[in-house]
Each structure stands twice: as structure tokens, then as C-alpha cells.
Amino acid sequence: MISNIHDNFIVKSIMPFVLNEKKHAYIVGGFVRDCLLNKDSSDVDIVVSKGDGHAYATKLAQYLNGFFVELDNINNIYRVVFSDKKHYVDIADCTGASIQDDLKRRDFTINALAFDLFNSEIIDVVSGMDDLKNGIIREISEFNIVDDPIRILRAFRFKSQFGFDFSKELKIILSRHAFELETTAKERINVELVKLFGGKHAVETIEELDALCVLEKLIPEIVEIKKIPPNSHHHLDLFHHSLETMRQVHLFYENSCDEVKRHFEDECFGGQKRLCYLKNILNQQHQE
């Protein structure tokens, strides 16, 4: 809902500046998606016309009495930290000739949505809102996925978080290019896996990772784990027992009192929730 965007603290704080600048500025990516799904989000990314990013971010920092941070001087990405040092907004130059071109370079249609802050309208050039409504994760193009293979794993992370289905073509792409994850930085893979494990639909997602032959590219040891039969205490082989452990943790969480839920929703080291780490710890104990 557009009202969710306007009601956000960060958006309300910068709107007077945006309107006074009289230049198009677009919120892009996950923030727009999450607002349309009625989910809380504080990850605000803004795109401005090519070449305007540095000046725009500098002026916004001055307006907010905040701080200007240069994140990437090659790709012209900047961060404006609010004076409270808790909130921030990232600002980048448009990567295409227009915002429409920029959006077409993104990974999935549900992430290729922009909100024009100046005109207060949503820009959707790849039918992302339809896919959002229908719960579909759809590729914009195969090239966009292969251009940065971590997007293969991002697809599964979004499935875990939202419970969406993959488009038929995306399933083919994910399976076809799974091998490219073998050369992707382990640090990037770890970030996505931790987020995936923290999703409400983690078990179904891992099952799909396995079905599309992506899991064994991420964790080669899984091939041997599947060969370990159940012992006298269990009725499932080690692989499916691990999945069942995760499923039971979720059931425990869903049926817990509010106080317990709040405890597991708290973030600990790495910015991840305790619930995510509990699933990992229990899985490791069962595999030892």
C-alpha cells in the first residue's frame, strides 16, 4: 500500500527535502516490495538521475543534520545517516538511461518496483505487482541472474521469507546455473543462507534447493549425508531428520507464548534472530 510508504519514519523525514529539490528520486527494491506486502521495512534505497547521487546525498545529510558516507565511489553509492545514528538511507546513481532501464537490470520482478517520491506513484515496468499479488518469484531475464550468481540463492531466500512459488522458467534457470555458486564468495553465500534459515518457509525451501540440485552445489557433503541411514533412535535418514528438526523448531516457535516468541525474535550477533541460530545449533548436534 502506498500509505505504508508515506507513513514510514524515514520517508516522512526526507519528503520536505525531496519536494523542495524538485528532482525525481525513486525508492527502489525491497522497501517498496515489503510495503506493498504490509511488512515493516527500514531498508530505504533511493535512486536519482545519473551523476546526481553525490550532490543529492550531501545536501540531504546537511538537511537532516546527519552524516554523509561514501560507500562505493566506483558505482556512486552513498549513505546518509540520520542524526540519531539509528536510521539511514542509501542513495545511488541510476544505472541506466532512465529509472525504467534501471529496474529492468534487477533480479526478480517483485524487486523491480520503484516509488517516485516526487509524484507519489509506483513504477512497474515488468509486472512485478502482479507477481507480488500472485505470490510468484519470476526472473526478469536469465542474463540478469547469471550476471551475479548470488541471485540464484537470493531466489531461495525470498521463497523462504515469503512462501512464494518460482515461475516455471526460473526453476530451469536456477538448476541450469547452480554450478556457478561454486565460485561465488563464501561470505556472500553465508549471508544468504543465514537469512534463508531464518525464514518461515525454510524447510520447504531447502527441499526445493535439493529438488533443483542446487543444495549439493552449496554443501557438497550433503551427498554423503543422504547416505547415512537412521539409527535405532530415529526413523528418518540424517538428511530428512535434519529437515524435520527445523520443522519442529518452527512448530515450537509458532505455538509458544508471546514472551518466548519475543525472545526468539530478538537479534543477536550477526544481526540475525535467535530462532535462526537455534535451528542451526540443533541441526549440528543431530549430525555429530
Predicted segments, located by residue:
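Catalytic cores of the polymerase beta-like nucleotidyltransferase superfamily
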Residues: 1-288
